[in-house]
């Protein structure tokens, strides 16, 4: 077992038809770390996430969840690895015809043999964790966008994953609600010790939660920077990284904006 490594990617190359999407990507994520995959639109960050959670196979390279190589392992090992992860996609993907509680209960009912009463207790615990206590009976259409994100987080946490993958968790949210989601991510990491891997281009969220960041570049299809948010902010050896991290609105030093290019 690779000591203190929750997940890693080694020499990952991805092509769709003849188009190169990711080129020779390698990095590792420590246990209990909040790790951000950063890049503008078209940089391949969501593609990388899909490969890390086993939804797609690369042209070459390896993805490890804990010590299991999910790109080459047997089916039984593959599902063992998947049991270690939870995923929240950008849309939150709640089933509209099911209540919030039923959405959160879905993976528990599908992958365990717990009784209905036990599942109800687990759902209550998860919803309380994300600040949605007593929202079990609401439909997704009856709650706000921020609440949908919280419900999606509760469902992603339903089976107590060691690693939580979040795809643009604050996308489409107003700044106040986005900051609340950032606080929730920090709280989950602290209380549960969950390793959290986030795909985003939201600079405010990166500085709020990330311990370490990799930055993908659309033109080279590769990692062009890696480090803490402050290290990347001060990395002006690379003009693109410098521009991405140091643009301001209204010529102030505090109001970071997104460069989604």
Pin down the residues of each PLM region.
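Conserved ABC ATPase "signature" region
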Residues: 117-134
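Catalytic Walker B motif of ABC-type/P-loop ATPase nucleotide-binding domains
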Residues: 164-167
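ABC ATPase NBD coupling module
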Residues: 70-86, 116, 233-236
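A short, proline-enriched helix->beta-strand linker immediately N-terminal to the Walker B motif
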Residues: 158-162
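Conserved ABC ATPase signature
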Residues: 139-143, 147
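Short coil-to-helix segment of the ABC ATPase nucleotide-binding domain corresponding to the Q-loop/switch region
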Residues: 98-106
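Helix-to-loop junction immediately C-terminal to a conserved catalytic motif
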Residues: 53
């Amino acid at each position: 077992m690779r000591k203190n490594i929750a997940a890693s990617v080694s020499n990952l190359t991805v092509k769709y038809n003849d188009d190169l999407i990711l080129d020779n990507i390698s990095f590792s994520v420590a246990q209990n770390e909040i790790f951000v995959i950063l890049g503008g639109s078209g940089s391949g960050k969501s593609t990388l996430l899909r490969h890390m959670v086993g939804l797609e196979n690369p042209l070459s390279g390896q993805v490890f969840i804990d010590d299991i190589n999910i790109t080459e392992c047997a089916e039984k090992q593959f599902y063992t690895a998947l049991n270690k992860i939870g995923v929240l996609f950008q849309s939150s993907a709640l089933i509209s015809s099911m209540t919030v509680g039923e959405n959160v209960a879905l993976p528990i009912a599908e992958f365990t043999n717990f009784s209905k009463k036990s599942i109800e207790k687990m759902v209550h615990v998860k919803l309380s964790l994300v600040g949605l206590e007593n929202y079990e009976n609401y439909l997704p259409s009856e709650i706000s966008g921020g609440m949908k994100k919280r419900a999606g987080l509760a469902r992603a946490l339903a089976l107590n994953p060691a690693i939580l993958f979040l795809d643009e968790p604050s996308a489409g949210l107003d700044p106040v609600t986005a900051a609340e989601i950032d606080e929730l991510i920090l709280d989950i990491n602290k209380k549960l010790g969950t390793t959290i891997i986030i795909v985003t281009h939201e600079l405010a969220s990166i500085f709020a939660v990330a311990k370490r960041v990799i930055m993908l570049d659309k033109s080279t299809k590769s990692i062009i920077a890696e480090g803490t948010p402050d290290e990347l902010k001060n990395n002006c050896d690379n003009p693109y990284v410098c521009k991405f991290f140091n643009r301001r609105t209204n010529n102030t030093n505090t109001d970071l904006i997104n460069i989604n290019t």
